[in-house]
Amino acid sequence: MLSSHYQGTPYDPYASYGARENRGVYRSIGINRNDFVALIQLRPDLPADLQAVEWVAYASNALNAMVPFYANVETTPAYLAGTTGEVSTDSFYWVSRMIAAMADASYGKSVFHVERYELRVLSACRALLNQ
């Protein structure tokens, strides 16, 4: 839902079909102007220390991948926590921003690769959570 950009309608700003004047008429949620999104997942069937998971993603919601964080952790791997003002591929934040910037400029050619990346990240994260 938070990555919606009116896919399949004449109002999709990334569409290559329909009347050009309709594209982007309505501001969609999933545009490359977002910077951060978080969702809280509560799993009451698990032990208390595993129940709350915060899923976080950076950059455009239409072009990002969410990763989970347990609510009760004290440290985070550097790749996920080490965000600085210097652009680097050593930071999940900056990688997410770079993917969004490049894919936004060539959406039609890039969306397939971005969707595969999103699914692989989600699958790997779910596997970690289910260990």
Features from the language model and the residues they span:
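C-terminus-biased signal that marks the final domain/tail of proteins
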Residues: 1-131
